[in-house]
Structures are given as structure tokens and as C-alpha cells.
């Protein structure tokens, strides 16, 4: 079915974080027969001979050199990734870009590009236009201190000292939606436009940056856990994807290639460890009980217009050529990310999942719902409550019998196959305690909550593409610059998508890191392609291929499609989720 894209896409389709880790599970079955070519790696998989063929990295020819960057005094050329290396294949030994020093013509300088008329003070180096009354006020309103030069005596900007909002610098950074990394600063959250109006939060004086519409502290959430139970792996994946999609939205203007690959930070060990355990549990005989606790401590909202850009980002945009060159525009996204954060809820959350052996649970005579209810009681009273009589409507008068079966710490009983914890916010010590193979106690939860106040993480956020920061106020050629940035974003996301990797075996997840693909294997599986195991066969979940080429423009729109064959679902695995065909506006 053909769907018209909406301007805002849920993070389930853009930033799936841990949910996508549970969903896009890949398979490559390369059966060995006859003579094996050189470089093929052999392995055993439940008595079946399999082979993984190395794939070498291939890059395109070099582009021509760009013009000399007048600000950086460098010029660039690039090569695009044609085929990433995988399964031990030969890597690419170049980074896909080359930079060399150059001398721009003397008639050009870093602020030469045409700028809109400034009716205030035009900053010497950054080219920023600020109100004339900001001169000699003690603030670095220009980003280069030029508005303070020549002042007889530089006073303090404000008579009273004020604190800076927690996490304000991270909120000024761009974010790369391919892997959720924060990159260089794109807006200037230390620009105040001369304002010294105090903003008091719990008797603490803060100074509000110009770009902010709202920054409030709010204590929402408790140390109580919300529990959900799932009879099967597919139910668990569907719920997790839907629940996480409500937490973050990413506006992109067009759909993303390999949409479900986005948002998961594969370099983060806490996610990769949980990923391996969950994928191992994709067999039909597993059930799941998941618990979550969330603390919301602050809310951040940007102004909707007239944002003050960070001076370095501002100069980089000014130095881009008006004629489109993918190499230079791609470098912007590598250095500053693809999006900026317009709204965010900050705090911390703790999520754990108990993976149960369904057959052993059924043999105890208790239901999955009974297990969930008893686990809720364990959490409310604070861990080892074996022998404590609590009525929860179970036949037999309480949880005593089931707690004996569950084990003293609930997650160590014979019916528990594994336990997965992912904690965000707080400090490393509290996170280490919480992620241990024990249910969290109320004292540990309080300790973690106190640490979250000093190390906030993103709980929910809304982002917009970087090109929306380009306005006619700052750029005389805003329309063409925005058009080029939007075009480059589409190319960059397509070039960098993990859908370009060959599928891994046994629900391993193929991840594109630079120019090479790696397989994140479920627990109990190993090898370059997750091909080595003594475990029985499991259902293989489907994953999307890359998007095909766009159709010719018809009117003002064009379409493209993709297939659920990378790999196709088999043996009862989950089908691909999301659109098979999409429509977007023509550039």
C-alpha cells in the first residue's frame, strides 16, 4: 500500500534504540558443498556444514576536488561506499574522503559570502549580527569577543551570579540518528542576548539562554516498577517497538533507508550485552516479564524560530559551496550529526527483562500472570521475601509456593533462563549495582535516583533535521543551501544504512560500522556470521532490504519500495514491520 509520508516519524521508525535491537534479526545461510573457495571459513551448526564467504570492501572512484574552503583553507574530495567489507573480508584502507591544504583566492575571506543586511553590530570573525546595545556588556555575544573590543572596562554581564542549566551543552549538540551519538554543537546555548532576568528553581538562580523557551525541573515517576508479561518473543518485540516509538520523534521530511536500523548505539556495551541475550531468547518456548521504572527530572523546549547558531557551525554552513557537492555537505553531517534536539525530557530509567522457560513454568502449575504478580510483590517489599505471606489472589493463598520455585532472588530460579538489565542516567557505581543479576532493592533505587540528578540522560526527545536551522535571517542563499543539505542528508543516510550488509545467520544483527559490517550474535552463537552453534534451529525474523531507486517524478512526488528479504522470515520468524512503499516530495 502506498502511504504519504508524514513530517514527523516516531522513533520506532527512526530511533528504535533497544527495541530495534530486538526486531531486525538477520540470517545468512550459505551451505557448503563441493570444494570450498579460498578464504571461506568453515564451521559446524548442529551437524550442518556451513561456510561464510568473506566480502571485500569496495569504494567508488574519487570525485574531483572541491573548491578551497575559505574558512578552513582546505579542499576535499570523496569516494562513496559501494560495498562494505564483511565476514573477515578485506577492509577499505581509506576513509572515503581526502583533505589537503590550499590557498583560497585573495579576494575571498571567511566572511566574504554574501550576508543579509545587519542593522546591529556585525561581529568581526563569526559574521553574527547582534543588537548594537550588546556591545561592551561583558558577554561573548559574538562568539569571538569582537563586541567587547575597545571597551574601556568590561563589567560583569550580570550583577548576581547564576547557575547554568544541567545538561545545557549536550542539548546544544547535533545528534546522529544512525547511532544516537551526540556530535558537535549546532546552537549556542551560552548566548543570552544581554538578558539577566533570573529564573529560580528550588531557590537556585539560573540564567536562561536566548534559545530556550522553557527549562523546568519536574519530579515525575517513582521507584515503583510497571510490569508487563508476554507469552512469546513476537509479542514482546511488538510491545517493545510500540512503546519505544512513543518516546522520541524524528522529523526527517522523507522516510529513512533501512528505517529500523536507526537509533541503536551498538558501541555501548550495555545495549550490546542486552541485545545478545534477547536474541538468544527468540525461540518459541520462551516467555518474558519486563519491568520499568522512570524518573523525569527536567523538561527542555527550544524556541520555534530565530535560534542563535553556534559560531563554528554557523561558519561551516557559510563556507559551503552554493553548487551541490556531496563530499562537503556529507562532512557537515559527519561532524555535527543529522538532527538537533528541539524538546527533551531528562532523567533516568531502569528496565529489566526476565526470560522464562515456558515449559518449566507450566510444570510448576503457575501461570505467567502469577509469576508477574509475585515479581511485583518482590519489588515492592524489596527483594528476598521468600517465606513472606502476601495474598495476590493466587490459588493456595499467596506467592509462597511460586517464590520457592522462582528462587530466593527471583531471577536465579530454575525456570529463569536469563535476565537482561538496561539502565540510563545516574553514575557508573549505581548502574553497576542495578545491572547485577539481582532484583533492585529500594535502597539501591534511591541511590540511583539521587545520582540521576547529577547525570541526566534523555528519556524522551523530539528532533528536527539540521537543514531546518538554515534561515534567511542568517543566509542570503537560504533556499538553495537548505535544498542542498536536504539532498545530502538523503544520500548520507542511504550510504550509511546497515541494510547494505549481508544478513547474519541465526538472528544475528548486521551492523555497519564505518566501511565494515559486523554481526552482533545472540548468546550461544559465535563466528564472523553467527554461524557456529550447537543449539537447535530457531525461527528467523525478516529484515528489510535497502530501498530501491526513486521513481521518476510524477507531479510533485515520487515513490520507491523495498523487500522483506534481507533475510526473509522463515521457520515461524517475525515478518518485517513498517512500510514497503513510500512517497515523498521531489527535490
UniProtKB/Swiss-Prot annotation:
SMART domains referenced in this protein's UniProt entry, alphabetically: LDLa (SM00192), MACPF (SM00457), TSP1 (SM00209)
Amino-acid positions noted as binding Ca(2+) in the UniProt annotation, renumbered to this chain: 134, 137, 139, 141, 148
Sugar-bearing residue positions: 62, 65, 547, 550
Localization per Swiss-Prot or TrEMBL: Secreted; Target cell membrane
UniProt record similarity statement: Belongs to the complement C6/C7/C8/C9 family.
Subunit note: Heterotrimer of 3 chains: alpha (C8A), beta (C8B) and gamma (C8G); the alpha and gamma chains are disulfide bonded. Component of the membrane attack complex (MAC), composed of complement C5b, C6, C7, C8A, C8B, C8G and multiple copies of the pore-forming subunit C9.
Record-given protein name: Complement component C8 beta chain
Gene that produces this protein: c8b
Amino acid at each position: 500500500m502506498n502511504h504519504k509520508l508524514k513530517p514527523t516519524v516516531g522513533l520506532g521508525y527512526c530511533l528504535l534504540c533497544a527495541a530495534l535491537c530486538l526486531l531486525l534479526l538477520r540470517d545468512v545461510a550459505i551451505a557448503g558443498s563441493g570444494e570450498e573457495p579460498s578464504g571461506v571459513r568453515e564451521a559446524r551448526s548442529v551437524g550442518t556444514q556451513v561456510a561464510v564467504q568473506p566480502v571485500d570492501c569496495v569504494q567508488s572512484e574519487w570525485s574531483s576536488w572541491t573548491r578551497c574552503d575559505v574558512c578552513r583553507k582546505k579542499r576535499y574530495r570523496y569516494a562513496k561506499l559501494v560495498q562494505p567489507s564483511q565476514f573477515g573480508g578485506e577492509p577499505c584502507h581509506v576513509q572515503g574522503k581526502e583533505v589537503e591544504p590550499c590557498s583560497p583566492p585573495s579576494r575571498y575571506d571567511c566572511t566574504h559570502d554574501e550576508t543579509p543586511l545587519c542593522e546591529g553590530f556585525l561581529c568581526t570573525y563569526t559574521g553574527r549580527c547582534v543588537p548594537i546595545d550588546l556591545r561592551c556588556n561583558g558577554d561573548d555575544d559574538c562568539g569571538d569577543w569582537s563586541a567587547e573590543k575597545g571597551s574601556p572596562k568590561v563589567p560583569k554581564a550580570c550583577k548576581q551570579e547564576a547557575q547554568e542549566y544541567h545538561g545545557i551543552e549536550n542539548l546544544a549538540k547535533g545528534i546522529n540518528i544512525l547511532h544516537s551519538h551526540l556530535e558537535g554543537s549546532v546552537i549556542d546555548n551560552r548566548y543570552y542576548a544581554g538578558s539577566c532576568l533570573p529564573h529560580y528553581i528550588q531557590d537556585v538562580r539560573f540564567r536562561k539562554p536566548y534559545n530556550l523557551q522553557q527549562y523546568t525541573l519536574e519530579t515525575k515517576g517513582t521507584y515503583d516498577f510497571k510490569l508487563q508479561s508476554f507469552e512469546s518473543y513476537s509479542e514482546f518485540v511488538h510491545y517493545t517497538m510500540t512503546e519505544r516509538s512513543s518516546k522520541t520523534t524524528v522529523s526527517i521530511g522523507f522516510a529513512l533507508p533501512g528505517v529500523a536500523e536507526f537509533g541503536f548505539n551498538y558501541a555501548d556495551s550495555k545495549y550490546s550485552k542486552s541485545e545478545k541475550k534477547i536474541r538468544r531468547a527468540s525461540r518459541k518456548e520462551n516467555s518474558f516479564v519486563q519491568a520499568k521504572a522512570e524518573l523525569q527530572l527536567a523538561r527542555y523546549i527550544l524556541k520555534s524560530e530565530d535560534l542563535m547558531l553556534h559560531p563554528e557551525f554557523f561558519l561551516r554552513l557559510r563556507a559551503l559551496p552554493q553548487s551541490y557537492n556531496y563530499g562537503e555537505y556529507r562532512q557537515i553531517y559527519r561532524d555535527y550529526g543529522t538532527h538537533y534536539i528541539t524538546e527533551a525530557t531528562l532523567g533516568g530509567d531502569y528496565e529489566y527483562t526476565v526470560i522464562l522457560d515456558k515449559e518449566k513454568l507450566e510444570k510448576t502449575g503457575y501461570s505467567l500472570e502469577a509469576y508477574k504478580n509475585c515479581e511485583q510483590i518482590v519489588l515492592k517489599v524489596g527483594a528476598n521475601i521468600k517465606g513472606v505471606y502476601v495474598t495476590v489472589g493466587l490459588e493456595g493463598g499467596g506467592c509462597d509456593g511460586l517464590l520457592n520455585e522462582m528462587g530466593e532472588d527471583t531471577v536465579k530460579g530454575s525456570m529463569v533462563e536469563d535476565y537482561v538489565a538496561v539502565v540510563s542516567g545516574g553514575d557508573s557505581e549505581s548502574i553497576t549495582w542495578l545491572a547485577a543479576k539481582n532484583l533492585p532493592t529500594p535502597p539501591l533505587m534511591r541511590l540511583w535516583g539521587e545520582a540521576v540528578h547529577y547525570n541526566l540522560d534523555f528519556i524522551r526527545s523530539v528532533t528536527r533535521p539540521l537543514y531546518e536551522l538554515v534561515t534567511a535571517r542568517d543566509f542570503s542563499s537560504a533556499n538553495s543551501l537548505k535544498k542542498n543539505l536536504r539532498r545530502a542528508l538523503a544520500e548520507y543516510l542511504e550510504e550509511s544504512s546497515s541494510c547494505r550488509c549481508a544478513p547474519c545467520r541465526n538472528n544475528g544483527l548486521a551492523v555497519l560500522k564505518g566501511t565494515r559490517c559486523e554481526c552482533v550474535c545472540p548468546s550461544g552463537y559465535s563466528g564472523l556470521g553467527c554461524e557456529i552453534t550447537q543449539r537447535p534451529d530457531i525461527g528467523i525474523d525478516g529484515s528489510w532490504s535497502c530501498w530501491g531507486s526513486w521513481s521518476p517524478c510524477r507531479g510533485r512526488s515520487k515513490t520507491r519500495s523495498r523487500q522483506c528479504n534481507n533475510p526473509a522470515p522463515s521457520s515461524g520468524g517475525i515478518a518485517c514491520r513498517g512500510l514497503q512503499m513510500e512517497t515523498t516530495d521531489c527535490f
